[in-house]
Design a protein with these regions (language model features):
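Active-site-facing substrate-recognition patch
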Residues: 20, 26-87
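PRPP-dependent phosphoribosyltransferase catalytic core
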Residues: 26-32, 40, 171-212
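Conserved acidic residues
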Residues: 88, 155, 185
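Short glycine-rich phosphate-binding loop at a beta-alpha junction
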Residues: 88-94
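Acidic, divalent-metal-coordinating active-site segment for phosphoryl/phosphodiester hydrolysis
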Residues: 161-174
Length: 212
């Protein structure tokens, strides 16, 4: 079985995103040790995502790839099958999707670039954009080091992220990529979240939850 999420996209939408299954659990999730969780399975790897409140009246199933090598490798293997052949470079926002971009780069042999959250003293002619994060609700800086421009300029680029929700990060990344002469031709993610997005190659869909 490729992918199981607690509630998935409709079957036609899943097919467009690369396939998937869903269970009748809906937005309720389950409780483990008193913590509300949302079950997922990708490439035979199962996880229970904690449901956490991120704003007034809004909670999300929190996917954390950091330190989870087994899940990262399973996700990368599935996304690699769906990477458009025209893609030449991968770009990912710091920080949670960095392990995924690294694993996907290793499998596909495509170089990857990390858009940092802050400007660093060693950066050469950095290019930046400010977006609003759905997780924190606060402005977030996206910065490309000028030293990475050669990997993007004149290239067809795929953005790699863990979860795509409002699209504010994507908008900022698209502007950064275009500013340095690249072309964003694909967006790849583990999950979309909230409203379904047909413009994202994802392995499944996560709903938003109402805090208890």
């Amino acid at each position: 079985m490729l992918l199981l999420v607690g509630v998935g996209c409709e079957m036609a939408q899943c097919a467009r995103r690369g396939g998937g299954l869903h269970s009748p659990m809906g937005r309720k999730g389950v409780r483990l040790g008193g913590v509300k969780t949302y079950p997922i399975e990708i490439g035979g790897v199962r996880r229970d995502l904690p449901v956490v409140q991120v704003g007034p009246g809004v909670a999300v199933a929190l996917l954390n790839l950091l330190g989870d090598t087994e899940l990262v490798e399973a996700v990368a293997a599935e996304l690699a099958k769906r990477l458009p052949s025209e893609v030449e470079t991968l770009v990912t926002p710091e920080v949670k999707a960095v392990p995924l971009a690294h694993a996907l780069s290793r499998i596909t042999k495509k170089p990857y670039v990390v858009a940092r959250k802050t400007e660093k003293p060693y950066m050469i002619n950095p290019v930046s954009r400010t977006v609003i994060s759905i997780t924190t609700g606060k402005p977030q800086l996206l910065v490309l080091d000028g030293a990475d421009v050669a990997l993007i300029k004149g290239k067809k680029v795929a953005v790699v992220d863990d979860v795509v929700s409002t699209g504010s990060t994507l908008k900022g990344l698209r502007e950064l990529i275009e500013d340095v002469g690249g072309q964003m031709v694909a967006v790849m993610a583990v999950f979309t979240e909230g409203s379904p997005r047909e413009d994202v190659i994802a392995l499944g869909h996560l709903p938003l939850f109402e805090p208890e």
